[in-house]
Regions:
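Asp-based, Mg2+/Mn2+-dependent phosphohydrolase catalytic module
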Residues: 2-31, 42-43, 47-154
C-alpha cells in the first residue's frame, strides 16, 4: 500500500470510536491541532472534540499532540487540555514522532497518528510504521499554498 494512503479515514476526529483503537491494539494517539482538533487559530477545541478527548482518555488511550505549528500556538492549546505535546514537529520528518514514541515508551505498532493532511500527517505515520488516520479538514485552507496541496491530496 502507498505511503500516501491512510489506514482509515473519518469525516471528523470525534467520529472515531474507541473500538477502532482497541481492535487494533493501539494504546496511543498522536494528534494534529489545526483543522483536526479545532479550526486554525482557535484557542480551544470544539465541544464535540472535548467530549471525544475525555472519552478516549477515560478508555485508557494515551493522547499527545504532535503539530507542525509553533510553540506559541501549540503550548497553550495542549496545556489547556492537560496533554503533552511536541510543536514544530516538521512532519513528515520522523525525528519528533520518534521522540514522542520514546517519551511515551511505545512502539509504532501501538500508535495512531491522526491528522487532516496526507503530505504531513499520513506520510509521517506511514513512514514510521504507525497507523495513519485521516480526517477531513474542519475548514477550507486560507492560504493558496495549502489550497494547491489539498487539490493534490484529492
Amino acid at each position: 500500500m502507498s505511503v500516501f494512503f491512510p489506514h482509515a479515514d473519518f469525516k471528523r476526529i470525534y467520529q472515531i470510536p474507541t473500538e477502532f483503537f482497541q481492535q487494533r491494539g493501539l494504546t496511543v494517539a498522536l494528534l494534529d491541532v489545526d483543522n483536526t482538533l479545532t479550526t486554525h487559530d482557535n484557542p480551544t477545541p470544539h465541544k464535540e472534540v472535548l467530549g471525544w478527548l475525555e472519552r478516549k482518555l477515560n478508555s485508557g488511550l494515551r493522547l499527545m499532540i504532535l503539530s507542525n505549528n509553533t510553540q506559541e500556538r501549540v503550548a497553550p492549546f495542549a496545556e489547556g487540555l492537560g496533554l503533552e505535546y511536541i510543536a514544530d514537529a516538521h512532519k513528515p520528518l520522523g525525528g519528533p514522532l520518534r521522540q514522542a514514541l520514546g517519551k511515551l515508551g511505545v512502539r509504532p505498532e501501538e500508535t495512531a497518528v491522526i491528522g487532516d493532511q496526507i503530505f504531513t500527517d499520513i506520510l509521517c505515520a506511514r513512514l514510521a510504521g504507525c497507523t495513519a488516520v485521516l480526517v477531513e479538514p474542519m475548514e477550507p485552507e486560507p492560504m493558496a499554498f495549502f489550497r494547491v496541496k489539498r487539490t493534490l491530496e484529492r
